[in-house]
């Protein structure tokens, strides 16, 4: 049922969204098969939104598809604080830098691939105060490059999935499970399992008891404090002669070579070993 409502100002709209019981349907990326429909209530999507006076003058570069989980979460962070959004999605490197400078962007959230596509750079951008990375594994070399482009920015990572939304914030190169929901996670054979109470609704979910297999492999930094690092996606491991090879770790080593800006490691079928590793380097 659609209800027509008139609001006296934007503050009233924000308040209505805060109290909304509406649901939003989004789809998984489909990188591991057919895209799956997931339904989230607005409150779940705003789980990580921060409110307050310190956030009201932010200017966000909008680098995600607005129909995806990450795009929705950046939208709500900006919208709920009445921030200005600058569309840099699918823009060229030159256009992105021009928009950052012209609009005096203060905050950015994007994938590591997006930031790598900003390289090389010709000048620095002093207005950017925070840079967030998510959706893919990052590396030290990229952090260093981002730090040079945006010298006044704090850099952090975020973990979010279409199935669950934002769950963890970064502490350095690690993530921390909040104490309040630490009992909602299990680790089985290095894979992160998420309790169904933290997920959206989908007919495609398959549970192991009350838990959902995220497909993310992790390693503990400090188990007692809920600190961990992501290693890779479970389905990304490549079988080479009976050994499970992590392409992300191989890419990390290649990226440490001077002059290398991007690296993509993948498996290619081989009649003797099953697969051999291949790398494309820029």
Regions found by a protein language model. Give the residues of each.
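ANL superfamily adenylate-forming
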Residues: 1-20, 34, 131
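Conserved pre-ATP/AMP-binding loop-to-beta segment of ANL
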Residues: 9-27, 54-60
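Conserved AMP-binding A3 loop
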Residues: 23-50
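Conserved AMP-binding/adenylation subdomain of ANL enzymes
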Residues: 46-59, 67-107
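Gly/Ser/Thr-rich phosphate-binding loop
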Residues: 107, 119-175
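AMP-binding/adenylate-forming catalytic core of the ANL superfamily
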Residues: 215-282
């Amino acid at each position: 049922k659609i209800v027509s409502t008139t609001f006296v100002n934007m503050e009233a709209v924000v308040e209505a969204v805060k109290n909304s019981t509406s649901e939003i349907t989004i789809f998984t990326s489909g990188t591991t098969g057919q895209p799956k429909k997931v339904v989230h209530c607005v409150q779940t999507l705003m789980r990580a939104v921060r409110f307050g006076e310190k956030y009201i003058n932010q200017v966000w570069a909008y680098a995600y598809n607005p129909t995806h989980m990450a795009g929705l979460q950046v939208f709500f962070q900006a919208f709920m604080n009445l921030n200005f959004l600058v569309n840099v999605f699918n823009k060229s490197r030159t256009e992105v830098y021009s928009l950052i400078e012209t609009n005096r962007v203060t905050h950015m959230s994007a994938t590591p691939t997006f930031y790598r596509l900003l390289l090389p750079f010709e000048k620095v951008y002093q207005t950017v105060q925070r840079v967030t990375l998510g959706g893919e594994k990052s590396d030290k070399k990229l952090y260093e490059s981002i730090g040079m482009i945006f010298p006044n920015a704090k850099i952090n990572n975020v973990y979010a999935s279409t199935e669950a939304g934002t769950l963890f914030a970064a502490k350095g190169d690690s993530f921390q499970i909040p104490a309040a929901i630490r009992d909602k996670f299990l680790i089985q054979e290095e894979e992160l399992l998420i309790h169904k109470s933290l997920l959206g609704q989908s007919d495609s979910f398959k549970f192991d008891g009350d838990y959902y297999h995220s497909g993310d492999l992790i390693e503990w930094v400090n188990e007692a404090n809920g600190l961990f690092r992501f290693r890779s996606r479970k389905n990304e491991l490549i079988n080479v002669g009976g050994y499970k090879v992590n392409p992300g770790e191989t890419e990390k080593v290649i990226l440490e070579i001077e002059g290398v800006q991007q690296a993509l490691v993948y498996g290619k079928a081989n009649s003797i070993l099953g697969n051999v590793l291949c790398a494309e380097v820029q």
